[in-house]
Amino acid sequence: MSIQTDDYRTKYTLETFSFLPEFTADEIYDQIVYIINQGWTPALEHEAPEAASSHYWGMWKLPMFGTRDPNAVLAEIDQCRAAYPNHMIRLIGYDNYTQCQGHNFCRFTVLGECNSHGTNNE
């Protein structure tokens, strides 16, 4: 008899969608369309997993002011991933009317246990 063991390492929970299953490519595209349809400005942030919960994340280029093409946002996500393959990447929709984030979710996350200082124990 074989006993199946799974990877029980903790998943980072950095936002509401962290508690749901990973988004499919179509669901990510739909989230980008939602951000654009709200009139919000898409932007990307990235950070190494060991520092993801301890300080602000670095921004990838400038926010994509005036971008109406979801494929352009996807292309930027791919470029950020190519430049920082081991970083977590978050997509943000900035609301310029209320001057705050209207929406955000992590596009790429990692598994790992974090201690109280936010560092990875792997």
Curated annotation (Swiss-Prot):
One of its GO terms (cellular component) is carboxysome. It comes from Hydrogenovibrio marinus. SUPFAM superfamilies: RuBisCO, small subunit (SSF55239). Pfam families: RuBisCO_small. Gene3D superfamilies: Ribulose bisphosphate carboxylase, small subunit. Induction: Both mRNA and protein accumulate at 0.15% and 0.03% CO(2), but not at 15% or 2% CO(2) (at protein level). RuBisCO catalyzes two reactions: the carboxylation of D-ribulose 1,5-bisphosphate, the primary event in carbon dioxide fixation, as well as the oxidative fragmentation of the pentose substrate. Both reactions occur simultaneously and in competition at the same active site. Although the small subunit is not catalytic it is essential for maximal activity. This is Ribulose bisphosphate carboxylase small subunit 2. The keyword Cell cycle does not apply. It is found in: Carboxysome. Keywords: Bacterial microcompartment, Calvin cycle, Carbon dioxide fixation, Carboxysome.
